Every structure is written in structure tokens, then in C-alpha cells.
Amino acid sequence: MTADGYVHHEVMPLAIAPERVREFVITPERILDYYPEPIEGGVFEAGRAIWCRGAMGVSMLERLDESTDECVVMLVTTAVGLEPPYTPEAIRAAATFTMIEDWAVAAEGNGSVLTKTWRDVLAGGEPSPPLADIVRESAEGEGGALVAGWNAAG
């Protein structure tokens, strides 16, 4: 993790329209397309907050107010070892770490380009270089599955 919080950055060409990409960012089924060892997901508040569970834990993705049509900004809160029922309050209280994901979307040809940036990995409110390394390793394996799943669902 760099001094400014940057963890990883990936550019992904997609065969779907930008508005579809923005929709998929806050759709549990599309996040599960690439989520590590996915199990299930759900919606807390349509268009604002979702959750996804995998073998390692459960994550809540919340669309932040700083989002624009060009860039959806998500706060990701991950809790390891949390048991159902999953609620925003329970996930926040049991948070192992949080991070920000920037999902920048631009039209290109008959599709779009998604530029995803992972940043600001925090544990207990403090920067966590070891967790940032784990996030980077996981992020480096997501792009292919995301592109395949989202293009198929597009």
C-alpha cells in the first residue's frame, strides 16, 4: 500500500453499456461472479447497499454519496467469522477491515471500459499494509472472472 492508500488498479474492457456496468456494481449476483469462493449475497437497500458471502467471510458494499455517473465509489466492509443473520450493523461491528473501491466507467465502442481501483485498506481505522497485500493478491485474480461473468450477463 502506498502512502496515499493506493493498493491496486485494473482496466477491464467490457462488452456491455456503461449504465449496465453501474447497475452491476451494486448487484449481488454480479459481485459474486468474481467474489472469492462465493456462497450467497443479498440486498440491504436497493441501489445503495448489498452483501456477499464467501468462504472467508461476508462483505457489505455501500455506494457512497461521492459517486458520480463516471465513477461509483464503494465502501467495502468485510467481517471474517460472522454468522447470520447479516445486517449492516452486525457487519460494521464485526469488521475485520474496510476499503474503498472506485469503479470508473467510460463508454468505448459498443461497450465500456471499467477502471477499478482498490484503496484505503483499514483495520481498526488504521492503515494495514499486511491486509493491503492480501487485498492486492485477491484483486489481481478478479478481472478475468468479472469480465466473463458481466459480459455473459450483459
Which role fits each region the language model picked out?
Residues 110-154:
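A generic hydrophobic-segment detector
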Residues 38-40, 49, 82, 153:
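Residue-level signal for alpha-helical context at structural boundaries
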Residues 1-45:
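Hydrophobic ligand-binding cavity/cleft-lining segments
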Residues 8, 46-48, 60-61, 101:
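Residue-level marker for the onset of beta-strands and adjacent loop->beta junctions
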Residues 32-33, 40-41, 58-113, 119-121, ...:
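Hydrophobic-ligand binding "helix-grip"
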